[in-house]
């Protein structure tokens, strides 16, 4: 079986949809729930969270990334893929240079100020992923 453009596009779409559902759940429910964690168990919770969320998120982000690279390469003249890939790079940069360091700080000093900072700092990723999926749906409607 040969992998087609449509197969890659579908994987890209489905990984985006999964990540949209996940990021909005994290933004509205999961991160705010950090405020209710027993401070005595905060280190255990944060360790658990980081391991488990990585197990869920990283495969989806990698699929999205590699599909985005392939789609951009195959269709570099389509602004949907260029804008999508730039959005993806911004999401990755924000994740690893802003959100991950906050999680690391929470491992050492679990406090409400850092949790509020995490909630606030996650909005750009939430907005970018939402923006990106709108671009994909615009492209789908053109096909």
Residue ranges and their predicted role:
Residues 136-143:
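Juxtamembrane boundary at the C-terminal end of a transmembrane helix
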Residues 96-109:
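Transmembrane alpha-helical segments of integral membrane proteins
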Residues 55, 115-130:
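Individual transmembrane alpha-helices with interfacial aromatic-anchor signatures
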Residues 73-77, 111-112:
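Membrane-interface helix-boundary motifs at transmembrane edges
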Residues 15-22, 60-71, 84-94, 98, ...:
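Membrane-embedded alpha-helical transmembrane segments of multi-pass integral membrane proteins
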Residues 78-83:
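Short, aromatic-rich membrane-interface segments at the entry and exit
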Residues 3-63, 107-116:
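Interfacial loop at the N-terminal end of multi-pass membrane proteins
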């Amino acid at each position: 079986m040969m992998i087609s453009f449509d197969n890659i596009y579908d994987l890209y779409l489905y990984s985006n949809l999964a990540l949209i559902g996940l990021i909005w759940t994290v933004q509205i429910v999961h991160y705010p729930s950090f405020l209710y964690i027993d401070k005595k168990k905060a280190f255990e919770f944060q360790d658990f969270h980081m391991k488990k969320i990585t197990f869920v998120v990283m495969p989806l982000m990698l699929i999205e990334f590699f599909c985005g690279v392939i789609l951009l390469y195959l269709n570099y003249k389509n602004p949907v893929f260029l804008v999508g890939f730039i959005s993806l790079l911004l999401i990755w940069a924000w994740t690893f240079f802003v959100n991950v360091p906050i999680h690391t700080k929470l491992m050492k000093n679990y406090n409400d100020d850092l949790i509020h900072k995490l909630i606030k700092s996650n909005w750009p990723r939430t907005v970018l992923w939402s923006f990106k999926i709108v671009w994909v749906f615009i492209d789908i409607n053109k096909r």
